[in-house]
Amino acid sequence: MIRIDEIWLSTQPMDMRAGMDTTMAQVVRAFGYIKPHCAYLFCNKRGHRMKVLVHDGLGIWLCVRRLEQGKFHWAQVHQGESMAISPEQLQALIQGLPWQRIGRQQVVTML
């Protein structure tokens, strides 16, 4: 099992032809560094392919996922930003499900 303490999602689309070194460079451009035990997620422009780069403390893993139908529900934040997501949100995201509200506490702000 690969230990993952933090999961970071980038809003910048990535060319899925990129190999290990190009993906690592994209992570450094988007996040500033590659931390051990962190996963960095990127999606292509069409939204049906995802790359995940993980530093396990000893080396780098590069995983690719493609949806046969539909698209990933990617973050709707400003271009160039990134955000942290939870493991539960990641599970929904990789299945192509809406994940943005998973794990949020339902807080009443007005009566």
Model regions: which residues?
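Polybasic/polar functional segments that serve as interface/processing modules
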Residues: 1-111
